[in-house]
Design a protein with these regions (language model features):
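A conserved beta-strand-to-alpha-helix junction within the catalytic ATP-binding
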Residues: 27-42
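Conserved micro-motifs of the catalytic ATP-binding
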Residues: 21-26, 65-68
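Short alpha-helical segment of the dimerization/phosphotransfer core of two-component systems
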Residues: 1-6
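Conserved catalytic submotifs in the C-terminal HATPase_c
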Residues: 27-30, 49, 54-64
Length: 192
């Protein structure tokens, strides 16, 4: 277990270093966020079940296509879901909501925190800053920082909201151009 934690920490530090230096080559493609969310939900089902967390997921009826790096976008969702799995109060609900409007795809994840959120939303995306009470949990303290940087690198926006013990993360991306869209999960764009 210690070896796995050390490996994860090392990977997070390397990833954070690459992101902050801008030393990442993005492989942009059209990604259907509906399918990616379903995959993420499947990956995290056991972790959520272990803490008796119920995931309430709301998805649009049509594909939600964004033009991003599929691997990096997966990392963003993984970090956000992992954050919820670690810090949500056991026995509560996690709400994952994906919607589209005319120009945007908007994803939000919210949960009730097991610990008091006695710091600002900005502090949550600073590297290594976590509340003292959460230091007993696994992790590098880099997850939200990495997620925010990866979203920005791909032209999106990640916003965090704290209200008492309620935590909410919202990710916004511009919809992919209509001519680029199809329902493939990872499709390389032929123009690149």
């Amino acid at each position: 277990a210690k070896a796995q934690r050390l490996k994860t920490l090392t990977e997070d530090v390397v990833e954070a270093s690459k992101v902050s230096s801008g030393n990442i080559n993005l492989q942009l493609m059209d990604v259907n966020l509906v399918e990616m969310m379903n995959q993420t939900t499947g990956e995290f089902a056991e972790k959520f079940e272990h803490k008796n967390l119920e995931l309430i997921q709301t998805l649009p009826n049509e594909p939600a296509i964004i033009h991003v790096d599929g691997r990096r976008m997966w990392r963003v969702l993984e970090n956000l879901y992992n954050n919820a799995a670690k810090y949500a109060m056991p026995g509560t609900r996690i709400y994952a909501d994906l919607r589209t409007d005319k120009d945007e795809v908007i994803f939000s994840l919210k949960n009730v925190s097991e610990y008091p959120l006695n710091f600002s939303a900005d502090e949550l995306t600073e590297r290594f800053i976590r509340g003292d009470i959460s230091r007993s949990t696994e992790g590098s303290g880099l997850g939200l920082s990495i997620a925010k940087s990866l979203v920005q690198m791909q032209g999106g926006k990640l916003e965090l909201y704290l209200d008492g013990d309620l935590f909410k993360a919202t990710v916004r991306f511009r919809k992919a151009d209509k001519k680029e869209q199809d329902s493939c999960f990872f499709r390389e764009n032929s123009e690149e």
